[in-house]
């Protein structure tokens, strides 16, 4: 079975952790591909350029200047750094975005009303991806050549417009399109019931528990899109979704998501 691994959070900023993750990723049995974010670095670059990052419910509002920044950071530095590191460890990785070979197309996200029922947000140049937007023939051909795709979260609308897409959405859509298992790796051991206690990992979360965790504020910020995409992946036929630490890719543990 194919495994789609998504890496994000602060892992990309931790050289030692990233190095261990890449070694474990290479050792992971079976066919696999990698999807990555890069939001922390993108935020730093924005601030250095005098652009204030705007986040709403864990998702980045992307105006024209922000789009330039995230494209440079995600498809440039982050993607090529990961590919170079994997290549140095003997993994024949190839860096890709959704624009390459038109393999992932996105639709501009329409303005949305937030959970409060009042606030309307225009996310700007942000794209939504569906499993039907993935060119599975292209992805399978790349995998069949013995290459390991490393996808950034920059896609396009097919008409020349670049779009910023949440990396968790890209990973869940690719997994659904390929019928692959999905493993989302970040700096925590899993979803925590107490953010100040790294050992408070919730082993299983179903839909009802997710709603309870949202209502209590236990799950908020960047964890919201992670879990929303995890449940979307399961509803679209992904056989298994696990959220876990990047340092424990090959071990048991983490949080298993169930419908």
Spans of features found by a protein language model:
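C-terminal catalytic "cap/lid" subdomain
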Residues: 1-259
